[in-house]
Amino acid sequence: MRKIFYDFEVFKHLWLVVFIDYDTGKGKCIVNNEDQLRDFYNKTKNDIYIGYNSRGYDQYIFKGILLGMDPYYISSQIIEKNKKGYEVVKKGWKIPFNNFDISTGFHSLKQLEGFMGSRIKESSVPFDLDRELTESEIKETVSYCLHDVKETIKVFDGKREEFDSQLALIEAFKLDMNKFTKTKAQLSAFTLGAEKQPNRNDEFDLRFPDTLVVSEKYQHIVDWYKDPENLDYKKKLKVDVAGVPHIFAWGGIHGALPKIKDEGIILCADVASLYPSLMIEYGYNSRNIKDPKRYTEIRDKRLKLKAEKNPMQLPLKIVLNC
């Protein structure tokens, strides 16, 4: 199964795509030719396409062209109207497509190029041109697109474990390869048999564990969570615990010394599957999971594999932590 990196550039009167085979380094450029794109797809549809922001954009341009849609319409709906790709290319599900998105979700490709010390290449050809592109403009756009694909490969090389863990997750649970385009959270939900439910509007109906023991010194932290005034995701509590600055909020707890220099025996204490175990012990698992025992079984199997130093524990860890 080959890894094919790709990127689309779309104008009103022209579209183009650049593909690069990861293992051979061979590239292919297709400009405004639906037949060539269809032929390439038929030869590579069992391989994995990898792009930057391809989950939300490029794969739908690809699918839309194969379905006879106008790529510029698709692009403008996604970018300008802020629509989801599946809302625009409604029959996209009919096109089998093994897509993997290497984007971070926090940075643009250009930002990462800068972080990696690469030359940031910009195109002087505006994407809102309302005319045919000249030969020189097409040549520049191809060069720009090729550069972006090569930079995407660099990002991939730096985040290879993301791809490997995704593949391991699919193989461990014998999922179809067309699930590759899903996020790890989506794959985990599928693996656990979770189903989307209507909004219950009860996320602040807090239930504290009956085993919770807090000294008087830190009782104010528990009281902070009980205070109706603090039932706001923007609120947070900053307080020292055991001499260490902590931040308590609704996404969790973070505590660390700003900086420290020490010598001697330094211990690093860790608990295997701490949060999954707490979820199991106190019934804090997602109510969308039909059979909570499934989660417990995966936790137990993961701990067994980890003790055996079996690498197959990694995809199970992903499911537990998502």
Residue ranges, per PLM feature:
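Conserved acidic
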Residues: D23-G56, I61-C322
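Gly/Thr-rich phosphate-binding beta-strand-loop-beta motif of the actin/hexokinase/Hsp70
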Residues: M1-Y22, I266, S273-L278
